[in-house]
Amino acid sequence: MKKAILVLAGLGLALTALAQGPFTCTTEGAKLRYMTTDAKGNETSTSTVDITKVISSGDIFKITQVVQLYINGTAFTKPIETVATVKDGDVVVDFGGGLALAAEGAGFILPKRMAVGLELPTGEVTVDVQGMKVKQDITFHKVVDKEELTVPAGTYECYVVERQYSAKMLGIKVNGSMKTWYARGIGAVRTDTYDKKGKLSSSQILTEVVIP
């Protein structure tokens, strides 16, 4: 169960400047580091997102991201690879075709033109990570706020996106919600995860951005 929850957190990361740039990092060789804490603020794991390849053609970018999860400094899973396509500033993340991951269902979309009140796509996705299938049904997906957020990596202007979901992992059904703060040129700056009662269960915070 713990592994499945960490995998979901890693997928959230893979969903990541210019004033009107996309809500993801487009610099090849960049590395984003995150820390995950429990509800009391105690560190439980860390993770990295490496931008390993960026291919551009006109206004279209294909960005390969590799996510690695760590517990006590030791890799917890094999790397998770995703490919994000940026077209006209909109970010579409395809969870299929990765090093340790395959998926069925709709991709994840972050539009260039964010606005409070904007409703984002919902739907179902089934992810197979190293033989472990995680089925997630997103039932609510909306931009709920815009605010400046300070994290260890810096201060960012962010849009806050709330997502409510029902997930099935290892035969166990989990209902919950997430709030993610997205910044242009970075992607996810912070993600708070809540249980079905709305109680905070974990936070994932950007601690460092390394640009080559």
Predicted regions, residues:
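Short, linear, compositionally biased motifs with a strong N-terminal bias
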Residues: G10-L11
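Acidic, serine/threonine-rich low-complexity disordered tracts
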Residues: Q20-I80, V129-P212
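Solvent-exposed helix/loop surface patches that form functional interfaces
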Residues: C25-T27, T85-Y156
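Positively charged n-region of N-terminal signal peptides that target proteins for export
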Residues: M1-A4
